[in-house]
């Protein structure tokens, strides 16, 4: 997916784009862009005028008509090239994805219980609801949910990430994608998509642009451009009638030529943005694909640019995801060494990052070495969501660690006493944003292990930048309100939702939307699906469940919760690029007006020579210079349209002021200079 990341275009893309530029000259394709269709019709008209001029019927010199005709056709081809080069980047990505999509032999079984009754079928014949078994070394034949087994899966063909991932039944890591490869163990998979409707098929369709529809903003802008074009068309037609009348009144033989008026129309129409509008949208989706995010629609990318509420999961986005033991706090006169020893014993079989960190801290702080967990007199008690405790029975003693309330009930039920000192330590740790794990031995509380969430480096600066952009950040966590408040304050988020439930997230999103906000969020579990379906920008993790992917309007192939911030940047960059180039295109008209209008009417009204502020050589050179600039500026702006305007984390007001200065004022100054330079060059080499 990201093999071409950072490249504008390679030789293969450019060759294919040049070829596609000519293929796109068909009337059906040209009609999809009304502004450029006008240039296309104008090119055909001047071609006819040139052919007629060869037999002596002309209102301008044949060489002048030929020159205008060539430049108009080049303008159409340049617009086609801009769109083709943007599509080419998507096609290159689609080619690599298509290589991963091949027909393989699937091992179909009737059910989990009858896994030995294997029928070999083509993956293309699999239907939704079929059950297949895939063993190490085999390719997953279709999208599905793991209903039994656990295995390492190589998803590099889809995500570009070489490190294998774990896929297993149950939980939020059960979704598998057709085209990936099982590299260890085995999986039994229930197919969740029909042939031709797989995740890979959707990816290929999206990156190729086949499934791309114009967004509401694109449609609105295109309506504006069409309206301006119609106005300029009416003005141009009126000018022809007016020039005939003026020529008769002034006793001049020839009115303004049709070729000159066609050149005027093309120069005044918003051809620059008209030529680049489609490529800007395609390039925006391509940049998202290069970030390993699949957008289900262009509308989702635009919505990302308008988002003003970001709902971010604490784990993995704001914190590193693994809490670490940082301190042993004994109570009731217990020695810290005794607490550390008991905490380590209870964690020897605990494979969670938190459990391993307790073992490491005890070793580093007190030199306590891990013991052999296979000793016959050790019975480990695993953590469950119901008991909220784990521990070990060892040498006629019971050691438990877990949530404060759970351990409190455990100690009291055994006739022990839970001290106020322990409550105070628990409250103090919670107020600091940590997680307290209370450790007890038999009916006595030994103390508390302080687990600390490690805030990711640089997140404070990121949230400060988002605040400058007018975006409010909300941390979503299952922690209690005290812990959540402390972490939120340290990370610098604007608000938080503690003890979050699926219903709570959904309600919060609806409340913000009722107030007129656009909300973005990430999710990976089935319980996230309702909130994802409600959010304006919903990024589902690729490692998540099928329900989450179907509810979201984007899928992050890297399954990185922090990607949401990058998605917002890409969305804003897309909107900025479109707005900036629209401003530049319309501002260009002022300079072209001063180049062409005096040149057209100077024969009828010599006094208009005062408007020739660029001191252009002649009427013909003025028209040529303007029409050449009109074509070349499209080519010059293609890299900007594809890469996007550079985005800065500042307020919308400052961005608007800056872009008006750069692209508004620049759109006036640049053509004045460029048209004058072109005029000098074509005069010097004798074109006119």
From Swiss-Prot:
Keyword annotations of the record: ATP-binding, Cell membrane, Ion transport, Magnesium, Membrane, Metal-binding, Nucleotide-binding, Phosphoprotein, Potassium, Potassium transport, Translocase, Transmembrane, Transmembrane helix, Transport
Membrane topology: Multi-pass membrane protein
Annotated residues for binding of Mg(2+): 524, 528
A family per Pfam: Hydrolase
Transmembrane segments: 37-57, 65-85, 219-239, 262-282, 594-614, 622-642, 668-688
GO cellular component: plasma membrane
GO molecular function: ATP binding; ATP hydrolysis activity; magnesium ion binding; P-type potassium transmembrane transporter activity
Catalytic activity: K(+)(out) + ATP + H2O = K(+)(in) + ADP + phosphate + H(+)
Record: active site: 313
E.C. designation(s): 7.2.2.6
Subcellular location(s) of the protein: Cell membrane
Residues that bind ATP: 350, 354, 383-390, 401
SUPFAM superfamilies: Calcium ATPase, transduction domain A, Calcium ATPase, transmembrane domain M, HAD-like
InterPro entries membership: ATPase_P-typ_cyto_dom_N (IPR023299), ATPase_P-typ_P_site (IPR018303), ATPase_P-typ_TM_dom_sf (IPR023298), ATPase_P-typ_transduc_dom_A_sf (IPR008250), HAD-like_sf (IPR036412), HAD_sf (IPR023214), P-type_ATPase_bsu_IA (IPR006391), P_typ_ATPase (IPR001757)
Functional summary from the UniProt entry: Part of the high-affinity ATP-driven potassium transport (or Kdp) system, which catalyzes the hydrolysis of ATP coupled with the electrogenic transport of potassium into the cytoplasm. This subunit is responsible for energy coupling to the transport system and for the release of the potassium ions to the cytoplasm.
Similarity annotation: Belongs to the cation transport ATPase (P-type) (TC 3.A.3) family. Type IA subfamily.
HAMAP family in alphabetical order: KdpB
Subunit comment: The system is composed of three essential subunits: KdpA, KdpB and KdpC.
Name the record gives this protein: Potassium-transporting ATPase ATP-binding subunit
Organism: Clostridium botulinum (strain Alaska E43 / Type E3)
